[in-house]
């Protein structure tokens, strides 16, 4: 146990020494990229609903990881929380620049879900996705963002709470109520109104 703590301390010190010049090693970046790319991309895609924009934002996020890695501190926050703060800020900047609230583009959503569905399956799936996205549009921005962090980015309630700055129980309540609200919207067909 003592050896493990000493080893972690040595690794942390090596990392601090490497970062004095503000440079992340290729191995560190590769490990981060391979471990987090899917979660980051899915969260971004969920929010912007456009494959090409999501890819651009994703590359900006990983560029920011390289340039801001020397600012990361394990004492302040877990790496996941730090990374998704960058991701969330990048998505916010995207919407601010585009001056749009929520845009629906279903041209490539099937790429995230299945490899090669049949035309019939595509038609059924597109209808279901369209209904879901219209129902999601009825939610408040905060609710959509929390659901995206929970389901698209696969963050735990505690990580979302730390990222947003609210209690873990508050996140649980928002997730539960948002899902109930979505269920009610979909069951009543209220998403068809607009």
Predicted regions and their residues:
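DNA-recognition helix of helix-turn-helix
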Residues: 143, 152, 158-188
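Sigma70-family region 2
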Residues: 22, 49, 62-77, 97-98
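Short helix-capping/turn signature of helix-turn-helix
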Residues: 36-38, 47, 138, 148-155, ...
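Structural recognition of an alpha-helix C-terminal capping motif at a helix-to-coil junction
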Residues: 56-63, 77-89
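Amphipathic, Lys/Arg- and hydrophobic-enriched alpha-helical face
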Residues: 33-52, 67-68, 136, 185-188
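Internal acidic/polar
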Residues: 5, 11-12, 101-126, 156
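N-terminal module of bacterial RNA polymerase sigma factors
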Residues: 1-39, 46, 70, 194
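Arg/Lys-rich amphipathic alpha helix in sigma70-family domain 2
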Residues: 71, 85-106
């Amino acid at each position: 146990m003592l050896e493990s703590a000493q080893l972690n301390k040595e690794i942390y010190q090596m990392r601090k020494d490497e970062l004095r010049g503000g440079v992340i090693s290729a191995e560190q970046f590769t490990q981060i990229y391979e471990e987090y790319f899917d979660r980051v991309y899915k969260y971004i895609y969920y929010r912007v609903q456009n494959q090409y924009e999501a890819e651009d934002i994703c590359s900006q996020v990983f560029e920011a990881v390289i340039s801001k890695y020397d600012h990361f501190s394990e004492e302040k926050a877990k790496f996941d929380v730090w990374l998704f703060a960058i991701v969330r800020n990048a998505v916010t900047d995207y919407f601010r620049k585009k001056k749009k609230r929520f845009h629906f583009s279903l041209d490539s959503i099937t790429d995230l879900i299945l490899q090669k569905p049949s035309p019939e399956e595509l038609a059924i799936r597109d209808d279901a996705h369209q209904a879901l996205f219209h129902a999601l549009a009825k939610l408040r921005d905060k609710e959509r963002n929390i659901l995206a962090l929970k389901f698209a980015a696969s963050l735990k309630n505690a990580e979302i709470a730390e990222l947003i700055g609210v209690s873990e129980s508050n996140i649980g309540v928002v997730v539960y109520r948002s899902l109930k609200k979505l269920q009610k919207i979909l069951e009543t067909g209220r998403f068809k109104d607009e």
